[in-house]
Amino acid sequence: MKSVIAVLVLSLVLVNFTQAAKDDRWKACRMKCYTESKLCMNNDSKCFDSQSCNSCIQQVYSPCFNRCQEMLRRREAFKRMFAFDEEN
């Protein structure tokens, strides 16, 4: 009985750790996008008034954010595939 409880506790810890790691990677990816888009602001002193700055941010941030989304989607698909293999 103790071994069953130990396995359940370990499973919960691993699930929580995996979720936290995923969240950290997601946050790191988004922060990288934000940092890259800030370069637009540093290159344009009138950033908040400038259409070119807004265009720069959209051209940098949107594709970067989409890459983060794709990374997350692929990771989730891989986990589902691995979980399916474990069941069979």
UniProtKB/Swiss-Prot annotation:
Keywords: Disulfide bond, Neuropeptide, Signal. It comes from the Eukaryota. GO terms for biological process: neuropeptide signaling pathway. Is expressed in the ectodermal cells of gastrulae and planulae. Is also noticeable in the endoderm in late planulae. In the primary polyps, is expressed in both ectoderm (sensory neurons) and endoderm (ganglions). Is not expressed in nematocytes. Transmembrane segments: none annotated. Residues 1-20 form the signal peptide. Disulfide bonds join C29-C68, C33-C64, C40-C56, C47-C53. Probable neuropeptide. This is Protein Aeq5-like1. It comes from Nematostella vectensis (Starlet sea anemone). The lineage of its organism: Eukaryota, Metazoa, Cnidaria, Anthozoa, Hexacorallia.
